Structure formats: C-alpha cells, structure tokens
Amino acid sequence: MSHCFTAVFEPCLINGKTELLRHNTRLWFKRPESPSFEGTCVGAVVGLNPGSAKGDAEIGRETLGNCDPTMDRILTTFEIAFKLKGLPVPEGAYVQMLNLFYLRDACASAAIAARDEIAQLLTNARDKAEEREFPFLWLAWGKSARADDVDRFPTKSK
C-alpha cells in the first residue's frame, strides 16, 4: 500500500526561533483524494513528538506528506493486525496520530528539553484531535514520558 500522512503544520515562536507544531496528523494506508478527505478512523496512537516528517503544502494548511519510519511502522503493525483478524483494511481508513507534545523535531532529546522548559508546548499547543473519541488508543512511547502526560487523554468508562 502507498502510505502517507496528512497534517497541519503551524509556526510557533520558541526562544526567538520559529519552530513547527504538527497537528491533526492522520496516517493513511492509501493516499486520500485530497488532504482534507475525512476517511474512517480505525484507532489512534500516542507518540512522544512529531519527528522528521514534512508536508508538501504551505504552513497553516492541511497538507499531504510521506511517512517517516515511525509512521510506516505504525501502519504496518495495523496492517498485520487486520490480516491476523482475517479482515481487509477498510477503504479510506486512517490512524490518528496524537503526541504528548507537538513540536516537530527529529531529535527527541532536544524536543523533550524544549517541552520541559516551555510549559506552553503542553498547554497552548494541544491538538484539537485529542478531544475526539477513538475506537482505541495505543500509547506508544518510551521512558521519557512523565506520569502526568497521559492524564489529558479521555478514556471511556465501562
């Protein structure tokens, strides 16, 4: 399948330098007709921060981009799960990519340092997609997460 993602990249001033935040990231199993295509969400993944993936369009607009290795790994894992269940990946399906914080930086340690120094990265720069409900939420990050990182993600009570 031809994996890709859609997202909105927004500028953010950090220590006098313009950095990018990546919001509403959707990982697509197959390239959608347009960046604003709605599609069907099959689940959500929470990662640490946006890595190196870049979009094709201008800042502040929905854009298409090529998946980075982490995004490809996530989609491949979902494809394996569908295959093991004996189900096809639904047409127009995507995985919503959420993050503990949304500063795009290929160097995770630099992004973590910025997050710890600048509280606005957690409070003012959240992704509106976090407010949605998803079929399930896969928490996928390492030791760098803090205990309070998970608190803002809604959970369904049984």
Question: Residue locations for each model-derived region?
Answer:
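Short connector loops at secondary-structure junctions
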Residues: F82, P88-A110
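Structured alpha/beta reader/binder surfaces that contact nucleic acids or chromatin modification marks
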Residues: L64-G65, L84-V89, E130
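A short mixed-secondary-structure module that forms the rim of ligand-binding clefts
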Residues: K54, E58-A81
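Amphipathic alpha-helical interface surfaces
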Residues: N66, T70-I74, Q96, I118-L121, ...
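Conserved acidic residues
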Residues: C41-V42, A93, E133-L137
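Active-site and ligand/interface coordination hotspots across diverse enzymes
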Residues: M1-T63
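Short loop/turn segments at strand-loop or loop-helix junctions that form parts
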Residues: G43-G51, L98-Y102, L139-K143
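Glycine/proline-rich loop-helix segments at beta-alpha junctions forming the active-site rim
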Residues: D105-K158
